[in-house]
Amino acid sequence: MFWVNGLPQTHVPLGDRSFQYGDGCFSTIKTKKGQLEHWQAHVERMEACLTTLQIPFPDWRTVLDWAMSATLKDESAGIKIHISRGCGGRGYSPSGVEGPVVTISNFSFPAHYLAWQERGVQLGVCETRLGIQPLLAGHKHNNRIEQVLAKAEIDGTEFADAVTLNVQNHVIETTMANLFWVKDEKVFTPGLCLSGVAGVMRRKVLEYLQSEGYSVQVADFTLTDLLDADEVWMCNSLLGVAPVSGISAPENKIDFPIGKLTRRLQGNLNT
C-alpha cells in the first residue's frame, strides 16, 4: 500500500520530478512489530542526500507519524520512504517547485533473507561498472539505473546478487548491499567517495567494530583483494548482516568459511 504525504494513494502526478528525473532520495527501513529500526540514522542519511540535492527537509516528526501508521505489525517487515522534490519547474530547473512530496510504502519481510543469514550468499561479479560521481557518491538518490542494469545482468543466473566494481575497477558493493571482509584479522571495506551507496547498516557495522577496538581500513580495493579474504559479509538495513559463502569471478571461484566475526556481528546487529 502507498501513502503520499500521509494520504492513501494509488498514483503519483505525472509532473512529479522523481518520476521525471529521479529528483529525490529514498531509504528502506526494517520494522519490528510496527517499530522502525535505526530511525535517526535513516533521517541523517536522507538529510545528507537532500542537502546535496538542495531539497528542503520535510517535517520529520510528521513523516515519522506517517511511517508509524504505515508499518505492518508483523514480527519483521519493512517500509520505504521516498522523497521527491515535488512537482513543477521548467525542464531540469527546480525553480518554483512546490514540495517536497513524501511517499511511503510497506512490504513483508523477504523470507529468503533468513536462509541467507544462516547459510550465506553465493555472489557473482557484474560486468556492469558503476560510474564516478563524487558529488552523489554515498547517497541513495532516486536515480538507480546503474543498479537496475547490474541486477538485470544477474537475473536468470545462478546468483542472487553480485559484486559491482566501478569504472576504475575498484570493488564498491553488491547490487543491493555493502561489503566487508577480514584478512589476517584486519577488517576492510570499500571507500565510497566516488561511487556506491553508504548504507545505514554499513554505518552500524562500522560503529560496532570501532566500539570493539577494531581498526577498519576504508580505501580503494581490487577484486583480487576481495578474493584473497579470509571471511566476507554483506549488509543492508533489511537483510542485516549475512555471510558471503563464495564469489564466482570470471576465471576464479573462491569459497569462504562463515567467520566468527560475521556471526558476532549478526548476534549484535541482526534483530
Swiss-Prot record:
Cofactor(s) listed in the protein's UniProt record:
pyridoxal 5'-phosphate
Q: Which top-level group of life is the source organism from?
A: Bacteria
Some GO term, biological process aspect, for this entry: which one?
Answer: folic acid biosynthetic process
Q: Which GO terms describe its cellular component?
A: cytosol
User: What EC number(s) is this enzyme filed under?
Assistant: 4.1.3.38
Which CDD domains does the UniProt record give? ADCL_like
> What positions are modified (N6-(pyridoxal phosphate)lysine)?
140
Q: Which UniProt keywords apply?
A: Folate biosynthesis, Lyase, Pyridoxal phosphate
Q: Which GO terms describe its molecular function?
A: 4-amino-4-deoxychorismate lyase activity; pyridoxal phosphate binding
Q: Which reaction does it catalyse?
A: 4-amino-4-deoxychorismate = 4-aminobenzoate + pyruvate + H(+)
Pathway in which the depicted protein is active? Cofactor biosynthesis; tetrahydrofolate biosynthesis; 4-aminobenzoate from chorismate: step 2/2
The protein's role, per its UniProt record:
Involved in the biosynthesis of p-aminobenzoate (PABA), a precursor of tetrahydrofolate. Converts 4-amino-4-deoxychorismate into 4-aminobenzoate (PABA) and pyruvate.
Q: How does it assemble?
A: Homodimer.
Q: What NCBIfam families is this protein classified in?
A: pabC_Proteo, PRK06092.1
UniProt lists the family membership as follows: Belongs to the class-IV pyridoxal-phosphate-dependent aminotransferase family.
Put simply, this protein is called Aminodeoxychorismate lyase
What is the species listed in this Swiss-Prot or TrEMBL entry? Vibrio harveyi (Beneckea harveyi)
| Encoding gene per record | pabC
